[in-house]
Each structure stands twice: as structure tokens, then as C-alpha cells.
Amino acid sequence: VRWATPVTAFQRTAVVDTELAGVRIKAGQRVVMFYRSANFDEEVFDDPNSFNILRDPNPHVGFGGTGVHFCIGANLARMTINLIFEAIAEHMPDLTPVGAPERLRSGWLNAIKHWQVDYTGSSATAL
């Protein structure tokens, strides 16, 4: 989720004049946060551009981070993602891509629409 977050950005409208990281923001102005920027912050992540599935700690801001806008379904989503990847690894340990993924890209969303893969099914637990 840190590497390729499905929601790429969100915006908020300032309700009062404020300052953020030295930038003055007037009431009514919009502010956009790009998750990719936050999730690759060199002050938070050692070598943020390296893909490391075992990264620990991994304090990404997927599901809203913490605070009043924290996603109420975050724990269920994390558990579901873990179960899905564990099942894939168990049943298709030799899963290999056949081609490049077909991606859905927009100003706000990032997803894989279609990705053809192959596996031998030689695992003892293969479906």
C-alpha cells in the first residue's frame, strides 16, 4: 500500500487562514496531499525508493495514517490484504507475470485493471 497506494491524493479546503510548512494558506483555498510524496519521505523511510516487503517499521499513510480522519475499516482491510497475499503465496508459489499490467490511472486513483499471470500449479496446495 505504501509503494502504490490506490488513492493517490486527497484535497481539503482551509476553513481558516493557516500556515503549513511555511506556506500561508487563506481560508477557502484548497490544499492537496499526495500520498506518494508522504509515503516516500526520506525523513521517515530509510531508502524509500527501494521495494522491501519486509520493511519494519513501515509507517505509511495508507488508510489515513492516524487522527480524526483515520479509516474505520483500516484493520479489516489490512487483515484482508494479508490473507489474500498469504493464500496466493501458498497456492501459487511460482506465480509469474506473462505481460505488463494494464493500469488504471487518474488524478486521484491508481489501480491494476488487468494483469495476465501464469503458474504451474505444482504446489501441494495448488487449487
Positions of the model-derived regions?
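Conserved cytochrome P450 K-helix E-x-x-R motif and the immediately C-terminal K′/meander segment
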Residues: 1-21
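Cytochrome P450 heme-binding "Cys pocket" and the immediately downstream C-terminal segment
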Residues: 76-104
